[in-house]
Design a protein with these regions (language model features):
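Nucleic-acid endonuclease domains
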Residues: 1-69, 76-167
Length: 167
């Protein structure tokens, strides 16, 4: 896994943009402002690392964020209070499985240290077959004993099952 420091200016611009816009375009489980902030910040960090401009646009993106390695890719970012570990999981909302996307790039943001981590990537078929699936409403426990209730059908894949990405 590779880490990068998040520029304060990008954080500020992302938060300000989200005050008047929403990234949620599904019929359910669109994420809170904080979750949308983490997602957009992660997507734009990945874009910048790959010498692409940051993107702040309204409307549905068609299910993918960018072209990467010749495929339609979606950047999925989780906010955490710690650095990611190989056994930590990445979440994929089941409502998105029919979107036009071929590749998923999983990232994490340590909110306490403003560090962006690229955890790895996988293709859609591998994600759907190698993940653990949980129904909406199921209780999910974390390493520290805390839990959350799934707001949507959820696939979880461990960082250790992802392909490594060197940029």
């Amino acid at each position: 896994m590779t880490s990068y420091k998040i520029p304060q200016l990008l954080k500020q611009k992302t938060w300000e943009w989200l005050q008047n816009h929403s990234m949620g375009h599904r019929f359910d489980a669109n994420g809170s402002k904080e979750e949308q902030f983490v997602g957009l910040l992660g997507e734009n960090m990945f874009r910048i690392i790959n010498d692409l401009p940051a993107k702040f646009e309204d409307g549905f993106d068609g299910g993918h964020d960018l072209m990467f390695m010749g495929q339609k890719a979606d950047v999925k970012t989780m906010g955490r209070n710690v650095d990611p570990q190989p056994h930590y999981v990445n979440n994929f909302v089941g409502y998105q499985q029919h979107f036009d996307c071929e590749l998923y790039i999983f990232c994490s943001i340590n909110k306490r240290t403003d560090t962006f981590w690229i955890c790895g990537y996988t293709d859609k078929q591998t994600l759907l077959t190698q993940s653990t699936f949980f129904e909406k409403g199921q209780k999910r426990y974390r390493d520290d004993g805390t839990y959350f209730i799934n707001k949507a059908p959820l696939y979880e894949i461990e960082n250790s099952k992802l392909n490594k990405l060197s940029i």
